[in-house]
């Protein structure tokens, strides 16, 4: 049986991977990779919380996990998948989703 810690570590690893491989198109057309700030704004959190979660010192709420899955266009259970198809994932999101 998996421990809570191993599940949280997998979620943190997958989230970080998805975030750093997602591009955000800003209003003036500039495209850059998603920052912790972008992600925090979308899920209603703070940059420090995202940083702590990616480091494994904080946990996300169920509603935050749901919003993250929706943002990346994945079913919630895929965020916990140890076989997330990491070699093929790239996505560009328009910044206006944060408003």
Predicted feature residues:
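A short, Lys/Arg-rich alpha-helix, primarily the initiator
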Residues: 1-32
